[in-house]
Amino acid sequence: MTYRVIQWATGGVGRASIQGIVSHPDLDLVGCWVHSAEKVGLDVGEICGMDFLGVTATDNVKELLALDADCVMYAPIFANRKEIVRILESGKNVVTPLGYFYPGKRDVSDLETACQRGGVTLHGTGIHPGGITERFPLMVSALSRNITHVRAEEFSDIRTYGAPYVVGEIMLFGKTPEEASKSPMLDVMGGGFLESIDMVADALGFALDDQKRTQHAVAIATRPIDSPIGIIEPGLVAAQRFTWEGTVRGQAVITVRTNWFMGEEGFDPAWSFGPEGERFEVEVQGDPNSKVSFRGWHPESVAAGLKRNPGIVATGIHVVSAIPYVVEAQPGIKTYLDLPLVSGRAAQEFAK
């Protein structure tokens, strides 16, 4: 069976998603929403640096919702909840990396109602959050008994993130520590990571305390550091670490952490990626302990990452891979705990 898909937004994740949709044997790209006026009317292939696809980009929501489509891959910079409700009510499933990984403790009655009205499903997935923080820890946890702690952690050179404005003006790299302390990222990312913690806790049976612990720490440059946002002068923020913890009687049992550095030299404190370098890590402490490092999701160089970042690609493809399973699911908000095991597909030259 072929599932008809609309791509919503064509940023880094969106472009990777389009590549994934086009190469997936069970998916067909039938529409594309774009934010930028200069992209309206262009063939989606041109936007993504691909061959002609025969799908024209538009910013006309009404026109897109009138299409005969099974699913929308929803990936703008920020989620518009009313827009998601509208898509669901139009009878289209939604997969997204922008949250809804495990929203049971939030008021999502409007989304649940929209799912029931449209007879469709909403599913949040991705990499971090959306994979490293819940799907993979849960898989690895099956190898241990008496689990006492689960950790999911990212170590990344933020210079490879191809959105300089976001890095400088939203993440607040290159600012003073006082300015960076006002970063919205702890709350913005926490919306997803706290859901991840709840999912792991519920699946493993941890009796979490009511409040989660959070921490935002920064390291400053000790020398000028060249970066895509310009020179980061000594005394300005060149590395950031965000931590979210689920605790039981005050003891951390689930830890999610993001380490974003402008390289890994010239910091105070002297943070580094360690001998293992850039990676994503999952660790389960129990009997026995397990530790898994995921590599290949970081570019080989800053220049390569600004052209194509494998971590961004992996995020988009993970969302796309879920589409057939989401379309076949019963209406409602569905998580990893509800869906079958999601897998990718063989390259065309090796397929059945």
Predicted ranges, named:
Residues 1-90, 205:
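N-terminal glycine-/serine-/threonine-rich beta1-alpha1-beta2 phosphate-ribose binding loop
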Residues 8, 12-16, 59, 106, ...:
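Conserved active-site and cofactor/substrate-binding residues in soluble primary-metabolism enzymes
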Residues 8, 141-270, 278-280, 309:
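Active-site-lining helix/loop region of Rossmann-like oxidoreductase modules
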Residues 93-95:
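A short hydrophobic/small-residue beta-strand
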Residues 97-99, 126:
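Short beta->alpha connector loops at strand-helix junctions that form conserved
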Residues 99-121:
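Rossmann-fold NAD(P)-binding glycine/threonine-rich loop
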Residues 132-142:
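Alpha-helical support elements that line or immediately flank enzyme active sites
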Residues 226-352:
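C-terminal active-site/capping subdomain that shapes the small-molecule cofactor and substrate pocket
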